[in-house]
Amino acid sequence: MITKDSIETAYAFLHQKLRVYEHSTLDWQKDDIEMIIGDYADQINPELLSMLSNGRPDYLKDHKKFQDDITHAVAVLENIL
């Protein structure tokens, strides 16, 4: 079951990290954010992650798609709130 609390928590965390990621000029900082979000994706409500990812197993974990994934996740969560 996807709770309002899990949506709000995911949105707050991902939104904050996205803003830092977008404005960062430091590769190591971006890499750290990708690693943190990848770890978070392993702990997020499984139903919420499935809804966001459309079942894609590498969602929020693929370096090449990371910025698109996190931007998508924040937009979807924002629309739900």
Language-model-derived ranges and their functions:
Residues M1-W28, V74:
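Short terminal alpha-helical segments
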Residues S53-L81:
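Charged low-complexity stretches with an acidic bias
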Residues R19-D31, N45, R56-H63:
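Charged, low-complexity interaction regions
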Residues E8, D27-D39, H63-T71:
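Short, charged, amphipathic alpha-helical segments
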Residues V20, D39-E47, V76-I80:
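Amphipathic alpha-helical interaction surfaces
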